Amino acid sequence: MDYFTLFGLPASYHIDTQALSLRFQDLQRQYHPDKFANGTQAQHLAAVQQSATINQAWQTLRHPLTRAEYLLSLHGFDLASEQHTVRDTAFLMEQLTLREELDDIEQTKDDARLESFIKRVQKMFDTRLQQMVTQLDNAAWGEAADTVRKLRFLDKLRSSADQLEEKLLDF
């Protein structure tokens, strides 16, 4: 059973996150291992496994990027285990330049420049995310997979910038 079916949702990028949360809570209560503590070892083990599946499905579907990756996996694009990389050299060069800029910001400890950098990277991420949503809506699975690969780069860059911001604020 796929994660969307588990939560009673359509296999789509656009999901009702409130319904997802409510269904998660219901499933948690229904399959919590403690409810099977007095049952057989097999029942307890089955509850533990089901609970783990529910938690994994919840974590996957609640985050936009992992939800997109999972949806793509249902259409034959298993991005989680693939070794395929981004082949767009212009994008890769841009990422290299951005990484160098972030390193320079770290060396100079320039808060204002970091704030501007974070906003710029967030805008780039949001633009790509909207592009991916359009591609998913149009069932352009291959194009969406390429965009997700690029979003991963931007997400890691965004995370690195946020970590640097925390580091600079600690001073």
From Swiss-Prot:
Q: Which InterPro entries match?
A: DnaJ_domain, HscB, HscB_C_sf, HscB_oligo_C, J_dom_sf
Q: Which domain of life is it from?
A: Bacteria
Listed GO cellular component terms?
iron-sulfur cluster transfer complex
GO biological process terms, semicolon-separated: [2Fe-2S] cluster assembly; protein complex oligomerization; protein folding
Report the residue ranges that make up the J domain in this protein. Answer: 2-74
Self-association and partners: Interacts with HscA and stimulates its ATPase activity. Interacts with IscU.
What does the function comment of this entry state? Co-chaperone involved in the maturation of iron-sulfur cluster-containing proteins. Seems to help targeting proteins to be folded toward HscA.
Instruction: State the name under which the record lists this protein.
Output: Co-chaperone protein HscB
Q: Which organism is it from?
A: Salmonella arizonae (strain ATCC BAA-731 / CDC346-86 / RSK2980)
